Amino acid sequence: MNTVFFYLQVSIKNLHDSIKNLRVSIKNLYVSIKGAGITAFLQTVKYERFEEKILMDFISNLFGRDKNQSFLEASKQGQTENVEKLLRSNKVDVNYQDAYGKTALISAADKGYRDVIGLLIESGPNLDLQDENGNTALISAAKIERGDIIDLLVKNGADLNFQDENGETALKFAVKVGYKNIADQLIDAGTDLNIQDENGETALICAADRAHRDIAELLIKAGADLNIQDNSGKTALVAATKIGHKGIVELLVNAGADLNLQDKNGNTALIYAADRGYRDIVNLLIEGGASLNIPDEAGLTALMFSAQTGRKDIVELLIKAGADINIEDKNNKTAADLAAEVGFEEIVDLLTSVRTYSSS
């Protein structure tokens, strides 16, 4: 038996074993058809009890995939004329996905080929197919900051709220990297502002966490939920407080955010501000009505944190606002005890004098 045909016979018999073997078989299939003719090839594989019709369908599919792959490549390279010719031939699947889940539309969106995208849309593709990473054409357009492509996709019915493998929407990605114009465009188009990613993070929490004040303001004005907590219990307010961003904290306080929500460690925004020495934020939170005496999981209050970190100015601010100096943590220690342990005598004296004055 001809060596090439024998190898081909074995390859086809084991197509199901793996994708690698399938690719080897396809390669040898082309070689055999070209070199020896289809009739001889069919006679060879009939030896293995393949039905001729099934085999012909298989061959047809191979050539079909080849055309679809060429179509995909033309879209990826921005070859407008070739894409148009292939579409007119009616021999390509506009929704064909390669091994990575890429469609012609996603491939064109990845590279920003608007003209190609326009041609593809005229052929009625599924605008919301996702690649192996969960990216849609819309998400891809957002990633390269192409508002014109986003506009084209949205006008033709693309879903704004698909999430990628990390749970991120087009809006979430735009917020993460600070694309204000894209975020604004997606908000105006009606995207869901409160979708949470795999970590429970919303666009607003993300904006606060990354210090994007202008985007946070957009989201707040558009009606984003101020009090959603991520998987760690963090709110947008806590996120902004932890990085010391007074501007975003002020936006959230003025918008009516809940000032007393606790994360999984029991920390409030006020506790974080006191612990990290953000006096202006402590003052903002106090003026906004934050509860002064909420303890964390270890029983520590904002006053205790400021006392043990030596921030006399914040201790004075909290005392003036009415913080309870007599609360004990889970180790039965007061703010004065904690200050004494680390040698902050001025704070100890201040707390002692307040206690003496209060009891007199």
Curated annotation (Swiss-Prot):
GO biological process: RNA processing
ANK repeats: 100-129, 133-162, 166-195, 199-228, 232-261, 265-294, 298-327
InterPro entries xref list: Ankyrin_rpt, Ankyrin_rpt-contain_sf
SS bond partners: none
Coiled coil: none
GO molecular function: RNA binding; RNA nuclease activity
Pfam families linked to this entry: Ank, Ank_2, Ank_5
The keyword Repeat is annotated on this UniProt entry: yes
Protein name: Putative ankyrin repeat protein MM_0045
Source species: Methanosarcina mazei (strain ATCC BAA-159 / DSM 3647 / Goe1 / Go1 / JCM 11833 / OCM 88) (Methanosarcina frisia)
Biological classification of the source: Archaea, Methanobacteriati, Methanobacteriota, Stenosarchaea group, Methanomicrobia
